[in-house]
Amino acid sequence: MILSGRRKFFYSFDLVKAAVSKIGPLTGREEKSLESFEISPDSRTIAFVGNEGYILLISAKTKQLIGTLKMNGSVRSLAFADGGNQLLSSGGDGHVYHWALGTRKCIHKAMDDGSLSGISLCTSRDSSLFATGSTSGIVNVYKRDDFLGGKRKPLKTIENLTTDVGEMKFNHDAQILAITSRKERNGMRLVHVPSFSVFQNWPGPRFSLHYPRCLDFSPGSGFLSVGHAGGKVLLYKLHHYQNA
């Protein structure tokens, strides 16, 4: 388990040994915060958002810096694809970058439709879809192969949020896309991806999501957890999915 905050270092927690290790500051780097990161699906690489357009690649095994990637603008969001062999990034220049981690090269860069500054990214488990979120609350959903092939228009533009897009997640079979805004009370929506319609009956009037900060689906999408600014984690059962 990796834990980080607005510090020059992060923590690695070994669940088996119940041991905590402090990692950093990273040699040769001047980042004052390592609060934003993503772990690859194969658990080999940790990618941290760095300063001045840099993405820091850390070995999950050794916890050492193994490389950097450089965007033209600031980095705001990261998402792995292709089982951890590729990385997507977005930020201040409004572009979505695709990186091949084997060569540490940018293999594709294109504008996110209608975005001036990208602040959120997520990919589906099979990497066929990805979603981008912007400061205007707009979420674009793309078919990744089409985007890489030069098609710039998203499959769908979702306009149900009105402030900065925060955490986004596809569930395991990419039937549901959860989107949030941490600046909006109850600022979370569940989108049915095949029809791109928003579930109007969720979470319902009896439940308050406060200001959502983070979320995740269980491996089989039987459960959805949401953490909010009030310091609580809410657990929901999704009855459509039989397996947890």
Per-range role (PLM):
Residues K153-E167, S197-P219:
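Conserved blade-ending motifs and adjacent loop-strand segments that build the rim/top face
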Residues I2-S4, I46-V49, L88-G91, F130-S134, ...:
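Conserved beta-strand element within WD40/beta-propeller blades
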Residues R7-G24, R29, G50-V75, G83-G84, ...:
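Per-blade loop-tip surfaces of WD-repeat and WD-like beta-propellers in eukaryotic adaptors/scaffolds
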